[in-house]
Amino acid sequence: MKKHIKILKKKLKNFDPKLKEECGVFGVSNAKDASALTALGLHALQHRGQEGCGIVSFDGEKYYSEKRFGLVGDNFNKEKVLKNLKGNHAIGHNRYSTTGENTLRNIQPFFADTNAGGIGVAHNGNLTNSISLRNKLVEDGAIFYTTSDTETIVQLIAKSKRPKTIDKVVDAVFQIQGGYALVMLTQNSLIGVRDPYGIRPLVIGKLGSSYVLASETCALDIIGAKFVRDVENGEIVLIENNKLESIKPFPPKKVRPCVFEYIYFARPDSILDNKTAYEHRKNIGIELAKENDVEADIVVPVPDSGNAAALGFAQYLKMNYEHGLIRNHYVGRTFIEPSQKIRSLGVKLKLNANQTTIKDKKIILIDDSLVRGTTSHKIVKMLYDAGAKEVHVKIACPEIRYPDFYGVDTPTKKELLAANKTNDEICEYIGAKSLKFLSLQGLYKAIGFEKRNDTYPQLTDHYFTGDYPVKPIDELGDNKVTQLSLLSTGSNN
């Protein structure tokens, strides 16, 4: 029985074709019920990681920690649990794993005692020099208990000989490279750090006189906090006694946030550059519509990721927008008696065709991205089986040809369909009548730029261009995902 359940869970995960953001972070300082506020913030960030969650709190004398498998709402919904997390200061973390064993010790936040006092660390992102740093630390006598690069950061902080914790943090971040957002808790401060290019997001909020740090603004909304600003690229914010100090230790660089925050990662109601992610995605759909070259009867999104782009597409062209695919939002948490028939259903466990809506229709099917193409193939077949006359696939971003090194769960280049096939070959593989990706310039225009600056790109867009703002130090080749994710904040293995 256990074997069958494991097979089913693996199949469910494999039929999620999206790139996966790896973790959400949250922190609050000097606030009543800090652990409860942190649990609410993590709940709002649940889309950034569903496999584990943790909170560390501080009451002025002691630190308290709770780490659990699964969703925030299933673990931090009881008063008894939250009462164990005493104090007016807390940080939290949602975990998304990629590979490796699933153990409680790998769930964040991590905690360590240093000669300047205790420190808790929650990390979203990935270090591109994590293996090199880890090997050097081990040579110097460090003992590691996990395979997470977050522990590497903790070890670097603990190893620093500087007397103040904030100086130890500065020492550590000078040694790390990659895309990262850190939220840390010490005996008298809340600290936020964002990488020099601002690849991973981190925002500042205010709840009365208390400060809040979070991966997205939606986590501020749920607790009634007001958005103040983004943590700037390369900035360290030190929050003590309800006062915020900005520290900028790095040479100035042009900010390059991850393009997939706009396309998919951020929750639709989160604010990115003064617009919600939903508005950005509608604008992406409008640009996709401007590049349209086929006629059809209806526009159908792949739910939920394609909804906003499909709506913008349909509104611009004055076409009918229809929910031709219905998503089962509960499949990942439902116990299903395993059988060969169930295991063979695959994508139907998550999606089903709305037959009367699509029968005898020429359909424009819109999704946010195409990675391996396996699910697109099954969805197109599902629509044809339900009676669709034609299925034209539109993708709301350019072709994904390159893997990620900054904390996103991507396949190797060998597994990325667009890296190995032409547009016509991909179209044939997924079984569509036609296939079109949004142009790179169209994507930049949708997000608010006149065009891409090829000398200093405004976004981290290496998925499409191979232009990495931070070059990987650790040479991993085609084994990149297997090796690097073992040391990533997402896997925490």
Predicted regions and their residues:
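PRPP-dependent phosphoribosyltransferase catalytic core
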Residues: 173, 188-189, 224-230, 381-493
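Conserved short alpha-helical segments that host acidic/polar catalytic motifs at enzyme active sites
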Residues: 1-233, 238-296, 302, 390
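Flexible loop/turn segments at secondary-structure boundaries
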Residues: 33-35, 98-99, 129, 199-200, ...
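Short, glycine/charge-rich flexible loops or terminal/linker lids adjacent to PRPP-binding catalytic cores
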Residues: 318-363, 374, 401-408
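Phosphate/diphosphate-binding loops
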Residues: 171, 219, 226-227, 231-235, ...
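Generic beta-strand/beta-sheet core signal
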Residues: 122, 185, 193-194, 205, ...
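A conserved beta-strand->alpha-helix junction
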Residues: 76, 146, 151, 321-332, ...
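Secondary-structure transition/capping motifs at alpha-helix termini
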Residues: 142, 162-163, 293-297, 315-322, ...
